[in-house]
UniProtKB/Swiss-Prot annotation:
One of its GO terms (molecular function) is structural constituent of ribosome. Belongs to the bacterial ribosomal protein bL17 family. Part of the 50S ribosomal subunit. Contacts protein L32. The gene is rplQ. Pfam families: Ribosomal_L17. InterPro entries: Ribosomal_bL17, Ribosomal_bL17_CS, Ribosomal_bL17_sf. HAMAP family: Ribosomal_bL17. The keyword Ribosomal protein applies. One of its GO terms (cellular component) is cytosolic large ribosomal subunit. This is Large ribosomal subunit protein bL17. The keyword Signal does not apply.
Length: 119
């Protein structure tokens, strides 16, 4: 993610953007974002769903450390959704829980947009 490594973009900013987007994907099943952010967020969403498939206390705590409150769900609701609904949905699937659909370029700054959604 070359745009993140520029001056003024700190590590804490990068991690917070990823945490926010992971939480939004879990809450809404899809988000619209830039292509580079979608590619980076995809790794973390797949990782957190793999944690949910283990369903141990340690995996719940690891997921709780990543997820944040969203506008429609609290952190506890997201953890509940992750460890009940999504865990059952992806038990027979080994990876590849998300897909990226390209939307084209945004009018204002000509950056490529994409939809990151759960399969």
């Amino acid at each position: 993610m070359s745009y993140i490594n520029k001056k003024g973009k700190t590590t804490s900013w990068r991690l917070m953007v990823i945490r926010q987007q992971v939480s939004e994907v879990i809450a809404n099943n899809q988000i619209t974002t830039t292509l580079t952010k979608a590619k980076e967020t995809r790794k973390h969403v797949d990782r957190i769903i793999t944690l949910a498939k283990k369903n141990t206390l340690a995996s719940r705590r690891a997921a709780a450390a990543i997820l944040l409150d969203t506008s429609i769900s609290t952190k506890d609701q997201l953890i509940q959704k992750l460890f009940t609904d999504l865990q059952k949905k992806y038990t027979s699937r080994n990876g590849g829980y998300t897909r990226i659909l390209k939307l084209g370029r945004r009018k204002g700054d000509n950056v490529e947009e994409a939809i990151l959604q759960l399969v």
